[in-house]
Amino acid sequence: MVKKINKIALAVGGSGGHIVPALATREAFCKEGVDVLLLGKGLDNHPNLCDLDVHYKEIPSGLPTVASPVTAIRRMSSLYNGYRKAKKELCIFDPDVVIGFGSYHSLPVLMAALKKKIPIFLHEQNLIPGRVNKLFSRFAKGVGVSFHPVTKNFRCPSQEVSLPKRAFSACSPIAERLASHSPTICVVGGSQGAKTLNDHVPLALVEVAKDYPNMYVHHIAGPKGDVISIQHIYSRGGVSFCVKHFEQDMLNVLLSSDLVISRAGATILDELLWAQSPAILIPYPGAYGHQEENAKFLVYTIGGGSMILEKQLSQEVLTKNILLALDPETIKNRRAALRDYYQNKSSKSFYQFICECL
């Protein structure tokens, strides 16, 4: 018998790679009439939460790693304070289920849920599971994953699940603007790894534009990106462009792009598959190499793009890869590979998986 879920709490925080799937889960559960509360660190003023009517509570946390004694004490104090506040919020909200989306930001909430014996589920977005998700999988009822190969890494039932994508309009001014150019290129570095792309990609694209005078670049520079400097590079190079810190209509940008140059976070990977957008992936070298594994999956398993490691990155290497990626036959083959893979992905929703496991 499938149990009715009335309330869920989502343990989340950190980068968009954790926030975006949490918001997609929230949307899916809200459509089922479920009351949803987000709990985690870094939610105040998070760009992914702007303009959304989201019920959330900020929960302190600390990174439980080796550090100087003073730093370690401060982090453990934040972690303990977060645990106490999370336990209080869970008592008030009284959810049927707590879902963790990885990162240490979710740790206090998962600890509190375990203490209160609230059923825990997890969602893993990457090909290499994060430490918090691996740790709590032994206590969880189940883990929903974005990509099937990662299911073998957990100590509880796991299933590839689908999440709804970010909302987008079929009549988008962005789509209309990009449709008037060819080729169209999207550059996106993510919420934390944009600087390297901001420093290298514009110069390479100015070189590429010599062969493609009608090229258009939609460059998402990230919250700390120097938008004005990037605009100057494109302007001096005679490239048509739009440069901004953040993009709310991301799906229309991807749908309208002939090529995406990006980091290899799980969210962008999932959206590239959905939009069937060929990509050049430059994985962020930190975080235990999970982005490199994500990139290898899209490039070598699926055949949807190419990969450049950051240590190999140069204007010459980028220019060569971009010119190859813009070849019409290359675009056609990579789109077909992405389409074939996406059509065979599991269609089971995370909501359905959780209901079945309870």
Swiss-Prot record:
Identify the residues that bind UDP-N-acetyl-alpha-D-glucosamine: S15, G16, G17, N126, S191, Q291
Q: In which pathway does it act?
A: Cell wall biogenesis; peptidoglycan biosynthesis
The UniProt entry lists membrane topology as:
Peripheral membrane protein
Give a Gene Ontology cellular component term annotated to this protein: plasma membrane
Q: Which UniProt keywords apply?
A: Cell cycle, Cell division, Cell inner membrane, Cell membrane, Cell shape, Cell wall biogenesis/degradation, Glycosyltransferase, Membrane, Peptidoglycan synthesis, Transferase
Q: What class of enzyme is it?
A: transferase
Gene3D superfamilies noted in UniProt: Glycogen Phosphorylase B
Catalytic activity annotation: di-trans,octa-cis-undecaprenyl diphospho-N-acetyl-alpha-D-muramoyl-L-alanyl-D-glutamyl-meso-2,6-diaminopimeloyl-D-alanyl-D-alanine + UDP-N-acetyl-alpha-D-glucosamine = di-trans,octa-cis-undecaprenyl diphospho-[N-acetyl-alpha-D-glucosaminyl-(1->4)]-N-acetyl-alpha-D-muramoyl-L-alanyl-D-glutamyl-meso-2,6-diaminopimeloyl-D-alanyl-D-alanine + UDP + H(+)
Compartments annotated for it: namely: Cell inner membrane
Extract the GO molecular function terms from the UniProt entry. UDP-N-acetyl-D-glucosamine:N-acetylmuramoyl-L-alanyl-D-glutamyl-meso-2,6-diaminopimelyl-D-alanyl-D-alanine-diphosphoundecaprenol 4-beta-N-acetylglucosaminlytransferase activity; undecaprenyldiphospho-muramoylpentapeptide beta-N-acetylglucosaminyltransferase activity
User: Which E.C. number(s) belong to this protein?
Assistant: 2.4.1.227
Superkingdom of origin:
Bacteria
Biological process, per Gene Ontology? carbohydrate metabolic process; cell division; cell wall organization; lipid glycosylation; peptidoglycan biosynthetic process; regulation of cell shape
One Pfam short name = Glyco_transf_28
Q: Which family does it belong to?
A: Belongs to the glycosyltransferase 28 family. MurG subfamily.
The role this protein plays is:
Cell wall formation. Catalyzes the transfer of a GlcNAc subunit on undecaprenyl-pyrophosphoryl-MurNAc-pentapeptide (lipid intermediate I) to form undecaprenyl-pyrophosphoryl-MurNAc-(pentapeptide)GlcNAc (lipid intermediate II).
Its recorded name reads: UDP-N-acetylglucosamine--N-acetylmuramyl-(pentapeptide) pyrophosphoryl-undecaprenol N-acetylglucosamine transferase
Originating organism? Chlamydia caviae (strain ATCC VR-813 / DSM 19441 / 03DC25 / GPIC)
Q: Which gene encodes it?
A: murG
